[in-house]
């Protein structure tokens, strides 16, 4: 699979040798076919290339030459036989928020549905796209999302234990199926443990979208409780930590108190 972003319909219609196909979902702007390659343009401006891997790579090189858009992914998803459960997490490295773990279960038919939605690693999507795609994913595949707030995280403070617990709970809820985990340090769950699994298995990519959507929703909730917008990540958080302290708010309810950048404010 190859994905381009910032692609215009008018540019695709000028391509020679491609025939128009009937769109398969309401989110498709245009679907073209040439030989063993499908070009699927979504309303977000993302163009998905699917089909024979060699033919897809050849077509992608041609599209790059004419600057059709920005190439953002060129890694084909691996395919397992039968039902596969993919799990991924979000907020693990964020100062604000607790943890969110999501699981998605799919077979060949549902994997095709996820591909037609344009599912990719959530890191390739803007926040708005993540929230929109998460809702679509929930409507076509079995899924589960586990979200814990900072207060619960801080009662345990053992992130490895929590991650193993939440990944397993998601997989157990969706069982049966082969469990693929986005591998993390100390991972003891899953039949297949792979680093960067969200770029290799479409089930994990879909789970990464659900987990990140859950993280955004949790940060929105915590922001409403704090009375000001809480930042994502851990790089630019000092002003927000200072604001928490100035307002006399309980740090345990908003941040991971075991993070080194938090300790100086306690």
List the predicted regions and their residue ranges:
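RNase H-like, Mg2+-dependent phosphodiesterase core
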Residues: 1-266
């Amino acid at each position: 699979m190859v994905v381009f972003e910032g692609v215009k319909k008018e540019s695709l219609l000028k391509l020679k040798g491609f025939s128009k196909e009937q769109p398969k979902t309401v989110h498709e702007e245009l679907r073209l076919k040439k030989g063993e390659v499908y070009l699927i343009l979504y309303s977000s401006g993302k163009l998905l290339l699917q089909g024979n891997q060699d033919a897809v790579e050849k077509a992608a090189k041609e599209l790059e030459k004419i600057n059709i858009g920005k190439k953002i992914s060129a890694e084909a998803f691996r395919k397992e036989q039968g039902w596969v459960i993919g799990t991924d997490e979000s907020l693990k490295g964020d100062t604000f928020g607790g943890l969110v773990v999501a699981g998605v279960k799919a077979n060949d038919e549902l994997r095709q549905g996820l591909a037609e939605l344009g599912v990719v690693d959530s890191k390739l999507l803007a926040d708005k796209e993540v929230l929109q795609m998460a809702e679509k994913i929930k409507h076509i595949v079995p899924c589960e999302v586990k979200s814990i707030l900072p207060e619960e995280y801080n009662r345990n403070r053992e992130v490895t234990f929590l991650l193993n617990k939440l990944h397993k709970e998601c997989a157990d809820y969706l069982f049966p199926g082969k469990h693929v985990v986005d591998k993390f340090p100390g991972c003891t769950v899953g039949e297949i443990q792979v680093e960067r699994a969200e770029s290799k298995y479409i089930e994990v990519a879909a789970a990464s979208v659900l987990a990140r959507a859950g993280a955004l929703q949790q940060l929105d909730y915590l922001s409403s409780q704090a009375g000001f917008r809480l930042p994502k990540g851990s790089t630019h958080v000092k002003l927000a930590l200072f604001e928490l302290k100035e307002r006399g708010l309980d740090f345990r309810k908003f941040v991971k108190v075991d993070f080194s950048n938090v300790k100086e404010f306690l």
